[in-house]
A protein has these predicted regions:
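A short acidic, Gly/Pro-enriched loop at the edge of an enzyme's catalytic core
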Residues: 97-109
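A short SAM/SAH-binding and catalytic strip from SAM-dependent methyltransferases
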Residues: 108-121
Length: 158
């Protein structure tokens, strides 16, 4: 399986976005999403669809003991390793559907702006549930269609 983010033209345009250049401070949703984070001190964290690894780095800054960031895109993982490297963070090129979610392994699973790409969302939710430790937290944020809708799109009337 390949990722649209491995397409050079698409990736080059993505790299121009404020979130790519400025990290979390350049992401419009960050300040609301940040408020949902639990205490990560000493916790194991999984970031599914980690992109540039900004949330992985934030988790370490908040005291996480171990963080794994997975993303289907080789280009994204390359950037994550370049921009957000830390001994407590491991990055892996892997699709969400293909990851072997070990049972009760993570205190927190992060998914920011990625699950809208997944066809079988129920399967991913079940896998995430299994991989969370008791009382674990799943932080989920998806893209609203208004954000990606073109300004010249026509309405469909029924």
């Amino acid at each position: 399986m390949s990722s649209i983010y491995d397409n050079k033209q698409f990736f080059d345009e993505y790299a121009k976005m404020s979130r790519s250049k400025q990290g979390l401070a350049g992401a419009g949703e960050w300040y609301q999403f940040k408020a949902l984070f639990p205490d990560l001190d000493g916790k194991n964290v999984l970031d599914v669809g980690c992109g540039y690894g900004w949330h992985c780095k934030y988790a370490v800054e908040c005291g996480a003991s171990k963080v794994l960031g997975i993303d289907l895109s080789e280009k994204m993982i390359h950037e994550a390793r370049q921009k957000n490297s830390d001994p407590k963070i491991a990055y892996r090129v892997c699709g969400l559907e293909d990851y072997d979610y070990p049972a009760e392994s993570y205190d927190c699973v992060i998914s920011n702006l990625v699950l809208h790409y997944i066809a079988d969302i129920d399967s991913i939710f079940k896998k995430i549930y299994v991989t969370l430790k008791p009382n674990g937290v799943f932080l989920l944020n998806i893209e609203h269609p208004v954000f990606t809708a073109g300004v010249n799109q026509d309405w469909i009337y029924d």
